[in-house]
Amino acid sequence: AFAPDHCKNNPAKRQAWAVDQVQKAAIASQKLGLSTSVSFTGSLAFPYLYPWPQRPDGLIEEAFEELGRRWRPILDHYKDRGVSIGFEIHPGEDVFDGATYEMFVNATGNHDCALINYDPSHFLLQQMDYLAFIDLYHDRINAFHVKDAEFNPDGRQGVYSGYQSWVNRAGRFRSLGDGQVDFAGIFSKLTQYGYDSWAVLEWECCIKSAEQGAAEGAPFIESHLIEPPKSAFDDFAGGDRDDAAISAMLGLSGRKP
């Protein structure tokens, strides 16, 4: 849908065009003074996520090996320009959770530019622990889509949402503050681990207008930004190391410091 006409119905030309566009994004990022960009991994294996008959042995492994072969030279191109890629963990792409991200990173040779664009909305709709995800992968997160969602299963539908319209789905995206995502917990976790990059409003709500979502969303994000303390609250009561005092406190006064 995005490719120019001369690439349509020609997979090889379309892929070459796409690689060129992604590489140009690295050059543009460098010229703009940006060190972070975002992308998707692409989908080779996702059509076989839940197959019947069962998929043949080696299918998933080969899909990820091919993803690695395609992405390694692109990631090298980004690294040469001082730019990293935050891959959005997103259903429909081959990388849609922590396990598949690990498979992808392994396929790239643990490339240090293959990072994560963290979007909790997709984790909530999969019923993942999106706070524990930060504990596991905080050192790989270089971008953050601040996007809300809610999941309200019932007797008729669950995670797959029964092909219903967005308004009628059990899982749906919401404007910031209207869903179920614990943003206070997320901003606290990211601050705890020293995150210092983007917090970008993403709006895809089926209930509230984009204009209202943007007007409310920007101050919502601002209200969640955390300024880390410059010192611990009880530092005033501490002091320099005093071996004699330590020995006395531990009842070791007869021992030489």
Residues covered by each model-derived region:
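Flexible loop residues that form catalytic
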Residues: 42, 149, 203-204
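Active-site acidic/histidine proton-transfer and metal-coordination neighborhood
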Residues: 2-115, 235, 250-255
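Hydrophobic residues within beta-strands of alpha/beta enzymes
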Residues: 37, 144, 198-199
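Terminal-tail/helix-coil boundary detector
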Residues: 226-257
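Short amphipathic alpha-helices and their capping/turn segments at secondary-structure boundaries
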Residues: 20-36, 72, 129-142, 184-192
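A short, acidic, flexible beta-alpha connecting loop/helix-capping segment that sits on the rim
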Residues: 200-210, 238
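C-terminal helical cap(s) of enzyme catalytic domains, especially alpha/beta-barrels
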Residues: 210-230
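Acidic/histidine-rich catalytic cores of soluble enzymes
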Residues: 62-64, 68-180, 229-233, 242
